[in-house]
């Protein structure tokens, strides 16, 4: 693939565009809520009317030369805010404008709008205000101590993926489904019939709104065509206008129509609310291949046109930074990327190899575009050819960090264990970082990160947190009180269960706030069974409902427990008093102790059963405290093991630890070993990681670093493919390769 001049310019424009705050959406939603039209409406209808008002009044942006149209803001990287979810103060805006990393320019006009209209109306009324008022002192103490985080305090649910249906369905078809569901309501025997009718009414309004929004683009394109002097561009504008009058009202039938159809849906989801890990198209090669093959056979699609369409589509994702985050939410995941994860490969619904020509084409797009968004991954099944993996390695070896590699068989087994049907499991994949989901049928919420190491710190200090000077955990005793390792683990288990109880209670209350005050009628249209159930996405309307809690610091916890067991209980090299004194002083003047803890103690990641047994212990304790516990949407809680950047935040609130780690330094990430602890190569790492039962999770993250020189060997592809397949044969979920040299790491 060679990037055309058109795509080259659009890519350059996207890369050069400055991330800035746009007040457009915040102003429109505020004016709607203040209007007479918003009064005396049910919550779902009010939200649908607000959605319609925004789409009717927001600026239409058509960028020069593009073939896929639509921006969330008035220009590329003009990023909206969502005051009904989280209201930014003037101080917040100043921080966003001036902070060194992940900043957003805030101009005087935006500040004025916030000061005069946004803040006066929403102060004390945002869902974040509502959440913090509802939380118990125990929840607030744990949150402030850094025991866990809460995703929904600044974002909305919506961590889900478009399934097959919506690539073959138009919104006029959905309106017909809504009509049938409305007619089936039983006002005689169903006490919730009226509430269901309001939900369906809201969904119907949302259908009309997205169709109207597409027509507005068609009208703007026709205006541009009327004054366009270049005949070729004029024809493109008219073709695009025709497409916007067709999709998303009706089902797409060409590659161009399908990409534009999806993009309007994407904009609808991220305009309605600001879902964590923004909605994404999922298994894009599977969706596109059907129409691509039809067009190629008919001779209606050239390679050049296809490359242009896909390049323009890729740029669209990069034009949309993740909405700005503040405070703890910024610390846990402060990135511009919105984690829209394109899935390639895997298996078909009948279980056969799904790799096709489009899979390879899209890998070419990823290689040539090389931009931050969208993210990408390959699902690797036993049935996929090695040539598919090698094609991905062509990109990985360049140090781009994409695509990541996922185990199709593990994903399917994880989903089957959770009660999904075989077809829904095969049609699923991963979204966000590594999170497993049944695409098009599952509402899966990420509720926050869980600091496994902080809980041990509290366990060693009778539940008291010296950083916040509060009694945060249970009074289970001090380090010196634990006469045996088993006594320590029993106390740790009680603390984990205690904090899981607090977190899950909070999760269920928070979910109710979204169901009651912030339903998502547009998003509900896209998930199977919300229409037939006449129930909102945020209220459990989807076929499957799951709430995840993400464990962080497994590698660190493993090394800490290994060190405690080895140095205190087994070899008796040190006493608890010596270890606690050294950690209280951050190992200042205790270098000899720190040296032994760091360099003369078994470590996770080296295929050492003595160390690795503790990874299994920690995993099982966390799993037992969370898995299967009911959520408020009719689903259950489950666990993931991933950090985004929360391992850095969690480290910053955790003191020095008995593995030799200095105070406030980062914890380990995902299920990877502690930084620098693995000494026996990548095979030992995957053997250690595979000792935990990853199939009981909804996703685990394993990062591996390789030097560029590794790929100079002609056998490197075969070796790395064998490593991946070996790990996946051991039920590993995910592996990602960062290719960097030592000099780059030192500079970083």
Label every model-predicted segment.
Residues 211, 218, 222-225, 234, ...:
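Heptad-repeat amphipathic alpha-helical coiled-coil interaction surface used
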Residues 201-212:
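Extended non-globular scaffold/tether segments
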